[in-house]
Amino acid sequence: MIASKFGIGQQVRHSLLGYLGVVVDIDPEYSLDEPEVDELAVNAELRAAPWYHVVMEDDDGQPVHTYLAEAQLSGEMQEEHPEQPSMDELARSIRQQLQAPRLRN
């Protein structure tokens, strides 16, 4: 079993670019199509580690879905981000849904 460093609903930062994001799903290892030679995912060691589906915002404040290796992320210590309140709201909403799932008939 592979342990992931970050959890669903957790806020993270891209280590190199500094973008704030929210983890929305986790793959225990790289699970997309075969990567191109110039992509980070060609590294076998990185492919075997967890990969994260992360929602971030572009420069216009629009949500962008990214797929990032664990090595590309760092944990975010702050809980409030006045410059990106939609990321705070998304993280809160996901955590709330995980704590109190709705029953369906």
Swiss-Prot record:
What the entry lists under SMART domains is as follows: YccV-like
What keywords were assigned to this record?
Answer: Cytoplasm, Stress response
Picking any one GO biological process from the record gives: response to heat
Gene3D superfamilies for the chain = Hemimethylated DNA-binding domain
**Could you tell me which SUPFAM superfamilies the record lists for this protein?**
YccV-like
- Record's Gene Ontology CC terms? cytoplasm
Q: Where in the cell is it found?
A: Cytoplasm
Q: What is an example of a GO molecular function annotated in this UniProt entry?
A: DNA binding
**Function, in words:** Involved in the degradation of certain denaturated proteins, including DnaA, during heat shock stress.
Of which family is this protein a member? Answer: Belongs to the HspQ family.
Its protein name is Heat shock protein HspQ
- The species this protein was found in: Cronobacter sakazakii (strain ATCC BAA-894) (Enterobacter sakazakii)
